Amino acid sequence: MKINSPKDLDFKPGSSVFLRCDFNVPLDEFGNITDDRRIRMALPTIKYLLDNECKIVIASHLGRPKGEFDEKYSLKPVAKRLSHLLKQDVIMAKDVVGPDAKEKASKLQNGEILLLENVRFDPRETKNDEGFAKELSEFGEFYINDAFGVSHRAHASVEAITRFYDNEHKAAGFLLLKEINFFYKLLENPVRPFVAVVGGSKVSGKLQALINLLPKVDKIIIGGGMAFTFLKAMGYNVGNSLVEDELIDEALKIMAEAKRLGVKFYLPVDIVIADKFAEDAMVKYVTAQEIPDGWMGLDIGPASVRLFGEVLWDAQTILWNGPMGVFEMDKFSRGTFKISHEIARSHGIKVVGGGDTADAVQRAGDDEEMTFISTGGGASLELLEGKKLPGIAALEIK
């Protein structure tokens, strides 16, 4: 798979570039950005274009507006933060392809940046509309996609727009290339032993990824709510824990396939249980076989943390996707944070995928220790499932 990098494009001073970023950052109720990692990770591409004296028009979405202007999804806070990080003005458009954006784009000087308003304020974005994509393409003689987090979606600014650029005028940004390289190396040629740590609430969300990962890994650790479907499949009583009964057969098939392939398959051996799903719940520690009726498992227990820590100890490659428990509640955060510390301590390559997992790593204070933290939740999961992502396929040099 050959994809251009920005360094392969022939920029001249004054070249106009349409850059698709993923600035879908979390905001608090006052509209302040609570985590600017996605903005910071786009800086290498933006700075490279600035060094080449390009005129840069940036597009991004934020949240899920209903295809019309909605102040709470405006990119104004992003423009402010980006300007602060770059230490230069970022011009903010009032619309996407309307008169304000077009006028401001026409007046851009070399080394200036225009940020369009949220592309999802136009309903044609999510429909992958070719007419809208053509209008966007008129902002730049070059196109760069640096938005891994939306590259699994065939949207106008990600997929349709590439039809208006030949191979010499389109590329993946440095962040997107980094994401692709990490995940492809991980799946095609990992340094062994390769351990996957898979958590999160539901098996259904991770089923395809598990099936695709099994032949590639040496060991697999299952935690989070999805573990209870596997525990129930083994005949354990799981009380009121989250279980997808319709996937019990699939869980049995996955365990049988792991055995056939010689992949060691680990489930929690003890559980932190609660009498209700709430901060003020009563809490007990029990073995995985002894969850009483009326109680639900909300985190892995200390023995599971020790066991998983030993499994991770000699790993040369670790992929972590999905928390071990309801880490948003303090009482049920210990398992996730301790596994985060165990992974951070390991000497191998440590790749973290998925939004919740990235949040957990940051809250555990381990983000500096990880080799790579992906910016895409759904996109990284689809890569792990072995799917081709529309935004990446559209950049391939045919």
From Swiss-Prot:
EC number: 2.7.2.3
Listed GO CC annotations: cytosol
Source domain of life: Bacteria
Residues noted as binding ATP in the record, renumbered to the chain: K206, G297, E328, G354, G355, D356, T357
Sites where the protein binds substrate: D22, F23, N24, R38, H61, L62, G63, R64, R120, R153
Keyword presence, Cytoplasm: yes
Major localization class: cytoplasm
Entries under HAMAP family matching the protein: Phosphoglyc_kinase
Name listed for the protein in its UniProt record: Phosphoglycerate kinase
